[in-house]
């Protein structure tokens, strides 16, 4: 970790020693800018009971630019497309160097609790959410059962 900026070292150490509830983030052994992330589906959401794997990459200009994050686990969510890309303001125009990896991961976890079909990335899912929320949530639960119940890989 010696060649990394101190900030990345400190953030990584904090993620390892003080993990946020329901979130695991582990740096790759060969690239400390790349993290394997697992987020547990929040209680009382259609994603409850699932464990969602993501990848997070810190670009060379981090923290001046947001980390690159995407879901590896298939998910039925209006703000996450089929490639795993996430529609979240702090990953785009609302990014600030004051934000940290931990903040990003907590925000993604919160997005699982409160899908926003009015700011979609997956337009078909958002339309389904708007026209029949009950059915869309049932499909999200089904996808969670099908794709997100595997144990977390280390």
Swiss-Prot record:
Which GO molecular function annotations are given, in alphabetical order?
ATP binding; ubiquitin conjugating enzyme activity
Q: Which pathway does it take part in?
A: Protein modification; protein ubiquitination
E.C. number: 2.3.2.23
Say which family it is in: Belongs to the ubiquitin-conjugating enzyme family.
Q: Which Gene3D superfamilies match?
A: Ubiquitin Conjugating Enzyme
Q: Which residues form the UBC core domain?
A: 3-149
List the catalytic activities from the record. S-ubiquitinyl-[E1 ubiquitin-activating enzyme]-L-cysteine + [E2 ubiquitin-conjugating enzyme]-L-cysteine = [E1 ubiquitin-activating enzyme]-L-cysteine + S-ubiquitinyl-[E2 ubiquitin-conjugating enzyme]-L-cysteine
Q: Name one GO cellular component term.
A: nucleus
Q: Can you say what this protein is called?
A: Probable ubiquitin-conjugating enzyme E2 N
Give the positions the UniProt entry annotates as the active site. Answer: 87 (glycyl thioester intermediate)
State the source organism's domain of life: Eukaryota
Q: Does the keyword DNA damage apply?
A: yes
Q: Which UniProt keywords apply?
A: ATP-binding, DNA damage, DNA repair, Nucleotide-binding, Transferase, Ubl conjugation pathway
Native source species:
Dictyostelium discoideum
Functional summary from the UniProt entry = The ube2v/ube2n heterodimer catalyzes the synthesis of non-canonical poly-ubiquitin chains that are linked through 'Lys-63'. This type of poly-ubiquitination does not lead to protein degradation by the proteasome. Mediates transcriptional activation of target genes. Plays a role in the control of progress through the cell cycle and differentiation. Plays a role in the error-free DNA repair pathway and contributes to the survival of cells after DNA damage.
Q: Nucleotide-binding: present as a keyword of the record? A: yes
Any one Gene Ontology BP term? postreplication repair
């Amino acid at each position: 970790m010696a060649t990394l900026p101190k900030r990345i070292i400190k953030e990584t150490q904090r993620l390892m020693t003080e993990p946020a509830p329901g979130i695991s983030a582990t740096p790759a052994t060969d690239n400390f800018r790349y993290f394997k992330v697992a987020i547990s589906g929040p209680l009382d959401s259609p994603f409850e009971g699932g464990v969602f794997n993501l990848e997070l990459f810190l670009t060379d200009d981090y923290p001046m630019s947001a980390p690159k994050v995407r879901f590896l686990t298939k998910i039925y969510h209006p703000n996450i497309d089929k490639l795993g890309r996430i529609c979240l303001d702090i990953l785009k125009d609302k990014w600030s160097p004051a934000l940290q990896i931990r903040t990003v991961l907590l925000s993604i976890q919160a997005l699982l609790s409160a899908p926003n079909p009015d700011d979609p990335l997956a337009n078909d899912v958002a339309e389904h959410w708007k026209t029949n929320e009950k059915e869309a949530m049932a499909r999200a639960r089904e996808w969670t059962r099908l794709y997100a119940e595997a144990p977390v890989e280390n």
